[in-house]
Every structure is written in C-alpha cells, then in structure tokens.
C-alpha cells in the first residue's frame, strides 16, 4: 500500500490516473485500488478479455482451440522474448480441457502468444488462425458477450463499483 500511495500522489500531482492491468491474481488488491485511488484509475482488461474469448473458442470450436493451443506451446519461447514472465513449459500440458484453462502457466502462455497466434500464416501466406477465430467469435457472439460481461462484472464487483 505504501508504494501505491506514492504512485497515487504522483498521479494526483500531474492529473493522471493509475493504470491497473487486470488479472485473476489481482482481484485481492482491487478493494485497496478502489479506496486508495479515490476512483482515479484505468482498468486495462484487453489481455484477460482475450483469454475469455479463447474460453469461448474452446467451448464452441474445440478443434480450433486445440490447434491454437498446440501452436502457442510450440512458439512459447519466441513469445517469452517479448515479455518478462515466468512460464515454465514443463507445467504446460500438451493438451487441456476446460478445467485446465485456469492454470496459471496455461493462461500466461495463451496470453503472451496472442500476437503470434493472430499473425501466424500458412505456407500459402493465408492467416493460420485469425480468420477462423474471428468467424468462431462472430458465430458465438451471444456467448462471447455473456462471457466477457461476466468477466468485467467480476472486476467491477471486486472494485466495489457494482454490487454482487
């Protein structure tokens, strides 16, 4: 809390908001963030929203998800060059079911490989996953909406911004 108060004082001095990156591991600090920031924060959820979208793909198109997962594991070391994360490939299973998706190493791997997954190409230069991923999400827009809404609601509840 001491560090947070210092950063909040700097933000107050310059009229900034503190940026808080979401993550299920951070829910425990959200009540303090809400209180100490006096509501002056920006919650960044793009990475965890991506993971929720992948949860939809896993449910709606398991074959596509399995291909993306395999590619992510194969390219994990490449992705780690862009991020300072502690993902141990030894703790990333070769395949997962819905119950395994919340394992920290699995989530980190799928989080940091998003750029590689979206930009991967076939030998013919066509998108390897992007087109099928977007199609899957469009075809399951209602499920995606409910999933992301629930995810955001969890953050807002932890921040005390909406009631449980």
Question: Where does each model-flagged region fall?
Answer:
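Active-site capping/gating regions of soluble enzymes
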Residues: 1-163
């Amino acid at each position: 809390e001491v560090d947070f108060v210092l950063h909040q004082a700097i933000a107050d001095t310059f009229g900034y908001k503190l940026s808080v990156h979401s993550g299920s591991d951070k829910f425990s600090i959200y009540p303090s963030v809400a209180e100490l920031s006096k509501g002056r924060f920006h919650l960044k959820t793009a990475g965890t929203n991506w993971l929720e979208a992948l949860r939809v793909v896993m449910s709606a198109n398991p074959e596509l998800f399995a291909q993306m997962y395999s590619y992510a594991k194969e390219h994990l070391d490449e992705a780690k060059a862009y991020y300072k994360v502690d993902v141990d490939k030894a703790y990333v299973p070769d395949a997962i079911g819905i119950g395994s998706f919340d394992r920290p190493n699995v989530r980190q791997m799928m989080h940091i490989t998003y750029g590689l997954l979206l930009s991967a190409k076939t030998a013919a230069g066509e998108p390897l996953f992007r087109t099928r991923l977007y199609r899957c999400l469009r075809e399951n827009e209602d499920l995606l909406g409910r999933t992301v809404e629930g995810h955001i609601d969890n953050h807002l509840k932890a921040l005390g911004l909406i009631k449980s």
